Amino acid sequence: MGRPAARDLTERELEVMHVFWSRGEATAAEARDRLAESGLDRTYTTIANLVRALTEKGFLRQLNDERPFVYRAVRSYEDVSGRLLGDLVQRVFRGSRAQLLCRLVGQHRLSAEERTILEQILEEPPR
């Protein structure tokens, strides 16, 4: 069986994944606390159920057999975000990265920092 598609993540599962990407390893309680610190107050049971679902889907791995269970992300942020973005380009923009860029840049004025980053990317030799 192949890896689950990144688009199979719900919004709440993605919130939980961000905790594991930033912390490395965590328990469900630690994930709940980190989310609460960032303004996403969820019950422990909700987070524990999301962690269980992420483990079953293959996004997290349980590291120990005794409580409290410690988990770590199996799929990296780069992998998941890249696949989600690729899926967005295919589904919404029919494969056109140019349309995506036009929409992104056309929506709001770029900050000086964003403009600098974009210029650096454009100066890189093509792959």
Region locations from a protein language model:
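Short capping segments at the starts of secondary-structure elements
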Residues: 9, 19-27
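Short, cationic-aromatic polyanion-contact patches
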Residues: 10, 65-83
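Pre-recognition alpha-helix immediately N-terminal to the DNA-recognition helix
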Residues: 14-18
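Short acidic, hydrophobic short linear motifs in intrinsically disordered regions
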Residues: 26-35
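Short, hydrophobic-biased segments on the C-terminal half of alpha helices
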Residues: 48-52
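Glycine-centered, phosphate/nucleic-acid-interacting loop/turn motifs that mediate DNA/RNA or nucleotide
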Residues: 58
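Short beta-strand "wing" residues that participate in macromolecule-binding interfaces
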Residues: 62
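Amphipathic alpha-helical dimerization/coiled-coil segments
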Residues: 80-127
